[in-house]
Amino acid sequence: MKRNNKSAIALIALSLLALSSGAAFAGHHWGNNDGMWQQGGSPLTTEQQATAQKIYDDYYTQTSALRQQLISKRYEYNALLTASSPDTAKINAVAKEMESLGQKLDEQRVKRDVAMAQAGIPRGAGMGYGGCGGYGGGYHRGGGHMGMGNW
């Protein structure tokens, strides 16, 4: 009797695995559109791609120091939180510094987005959601897709 139960459970498990794995092989994975990052709409021309790449490269160059500062503050914040006796005043001060750095990055992101719009590059085109930009590569207050994570 036990052997039949084990066989039945194994058969059910294999069946469920086979049925659920079909989604992994179906079409465009999570909207990736065969490697094109643009979310719908018509593909970018070669000129638009070059323009978008330059805008993003400039953005990353201009925000590199800010992003590094934010990462350092994030480590400092986490270290303060894990101290044997956390100092609330220091934690609040570092949190305010992180917020200020985040606002500066937001301002740069807006400038980048305006430059993209002025270049005629539709929203959602180029480097994917959020352009991998922002706080440590993807933190955009409620989303993003990669990066150092949220504080």
From Swiss-Prot:
Its main location: periplasm. Induction: Expression is induced by indole. Expression is regulated by the ZraSR two-component system. Keywords: Periplasm, Signal, Stress response, Zinc. It comes from the Bacteria. It comes from Salmonella typhimurium (strain LT2 / SGSC1412 / ATCC 700720). Chaperone activity is enhanced by zinc and inhibited in the presence of EDTA. NCBIfam families: PRK11546.1 (NF008584). Disruption phenotype: Mutation does not affect growth or survival rate, but mutant is significantly more sensitive to polymyxin B. GO terms for cellular component: periplasmic space. It is found in: Periplasm. Belongs to the ZraP family. GO terms for molecular function: zinc ion binding. InterPro entries: Metal_resist. Forms oligomers. Stabilization of high-order structures requires zinc. Gene3D superfamilies: 1.20.120.1490. Part of the Zra signaling pathway, an envelope stress response (ESR) system composed of the periplasmic accessory protein ZraP, the histidine kinase ZraS and the transcriptional regulator ZraR. The ZraPSR system contributes to antibiotic resistance and is important for membrane integrity in the presence of membrane-targeting biocides. ZraP acts as a modulator which has both a regulatory and a chaperone function. The zinc-bound form of ZraP modulates the response of the ZraPSR system by inhibiting the expression of the zra genes, probably by interacting with ZraS. Residues 1-26 form the signal peptide. This is Signaling pathway modulator ZraP.
